[in-house]
Amino acid sequence: MAFKLQAPYSPAGDQPEAIQQLTEGLLNGESYQTLLGVTGSGKTYTIANVIQNVQRPTLVLTHNKTLVAQLYGEFKQFFPDNAVGYFVSYYDYYQPEAYMPVSDTYIEKDLSINEELDKLRLHATSELLSGRRDIIVVASVSCIYGMGNPTEFENGIIRISKGQVISRQGFLHSLVNALYSRSQEEFRRGTFRVKGDTVDINLPYMDYGYRITFFGDEIEEIESFDVKNGKRIGKLDNAAVFPANLYLAPKDQLQQVLYEIQDECKAQVDYFKATGKYIEAQRLSERVNYDVEMIRELGYCNGVENYSRFFDRRKPGTRPFCLLDYFPKDFLCVIDESHQTIPQVSGMYGGDRSRKLILVDYGFRLPSALDNRPLNFHEFESLLHQTIFVSATPDHFELEKTGGVVVEQVVRPTGLLDPPIEIRPSVNQIDDLLDEIDKRIRKGDRVLVTTLTKRMAEEMDKYLARINIKSKYIHSEVDTLERVEILRQLRLGEIDVLVGVNLLREGLDLPEVSLVAILDADKEGFLRNEKSLTQTAGRAARNVDGLVIFYADKMTESMQRTIDETDRRREKQVAYNIEHGITPRTIIKSREQVFGQTSVLDIKGFDPKNPYAIANDEELVTVAAEDQEVYKTIPQIEKAIGRTKKEMEKAARDLDFMEAARLRDEMFLMQKKLAEMKA
């Protein structure tokens, strides 16, 4: 099937020329191109047109999960008949394994996996290996981290057809080899159950399952059915059952893998003994022998990913497989907000390696664990075929790759101008801000407020709640899908003010926002440099009444450059509007369009009749963002209580009694929830 773009409008403003230049560049074999597009100029729509023109599988890579969710929703709207995948880290909580030699403290790996995100990851990879070329995968930096061998994953696909001759027992063995588990009681994702001649499979990457009926050694019927109520959806002549996990190891080579692990362990233990490190030698020997026995008996162990090089049959030092290996060689890579995404991709390898080197040096892991890692930047570049950088503020790397040549998209189809920027003193800034918020709320508009720290964001939200202003805060500790829910709330008018730190920036499509207030704008640094100020100010560029207020007591170079660039763009935009007789207008999106742009929520059973299913303001006054995490099982919430108690005790030891009190309240809430779950 070919990509077929569906939109109620046609390219306008600078879009037609940008689409033509980018398409011609790809067809002429250019490796790198840069789209410099201002906020609200329709960069996503431009890229969608380019994808339709070149008809290639596409990876859209961006730097934060909130933006991934928005782009996923937009591409789903543009390409409803094509495959659009969502690929981010599936952890709600992740504490990596680490060792701190100074205090002799070993921190065991701790994590909580979000099953819905895992389902979306599996769905994206399954679609890629299905052979279809009309696929777009929107991903975070998680796509450069190690995954299973795509060849083994593809070999693990079970293809069945009506009338096929295969014994029921043989089919069940195939399911087990594909990492499905048998379960008669709890029919979870990635399990199957057997009732007489019928086998039900709960597909881990879909919302439905397969029901296969046997007649002797022949498949008599294949049906798809709703796993929640068992009702039949339809009949099939053919079906493909993809593996239940991305980490599929070859069973026939397991014994050889274990021998190789033990050989490396012996060599490393001998090295430790030769250098007088007897404690490290004993620690490593005990740990590896235990892991080997676990793998031999159960097929896995805690931290099995540290042995991935052996299971993947890779040579020492070679890169791991990742999502990019699942794409065909001629895929198109679009790096959105490249000024943020490129540095993030570059930094992953170094941080991971420094942590693991300590684990290896002190006998907690084998040297081969260093090969369980994200790609370094050179490896990432080597996998790219053709790349389009997209940013309103491209950095030196993008400009160097394209020889300083950019495709500029400054004029918006809506005729909207960059919002004017006002500078106001920080004295009485809160009173002034409240006056401005009141004006916007009366008009039915929304407001974004950015602070310098997470604590300031939370305190600001509490203050606004106390004076009956409907608000929420959002920062990196708010769960992935909860961030999208909060943005949906803002757009639908359930809340009027959103307070943030560094997430209220790149790419967020919020036409309802007419005021962006930046507190401490003169505190020069990472959060208040030219790129940050430009990106944050751009959130008001989708509204005809957009205004940006810098609360500052002095003019910094970053502030001045931001204002100068804004004035330059406004001049060009005004001239274009006069020439073409365009009157600027806000694009007000319908309720259905808002739900469409945040459609990633709908995969977790989101109920459109109750779209505000997150914590209320009363709870937020006393409980921080991480307290709202949804723990679905008793073991999960017990682990969370233990973790919170440790953090509370540490805060008390550090004499941070406000934080300790907050954590105490959080722990009490979770204990109450645990009691209700056990009742």
Region spans (language model):
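Conserved strand-helix element at the start of the C-terminal RecA-like helicase core
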Residues: 57-69, 86, 139, 277-280, ...
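Conserved helicase ATPase core of P-loop NTP-dependent helicases/translocases
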Residues: 459, 478-501
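Pre-Walker A (Motif I) flank of P-loop NTPase domains
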Residues: 27-34, 56-57, 133-135, 445-446
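ATP-binding Walker
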Residues: 41, 66, 503
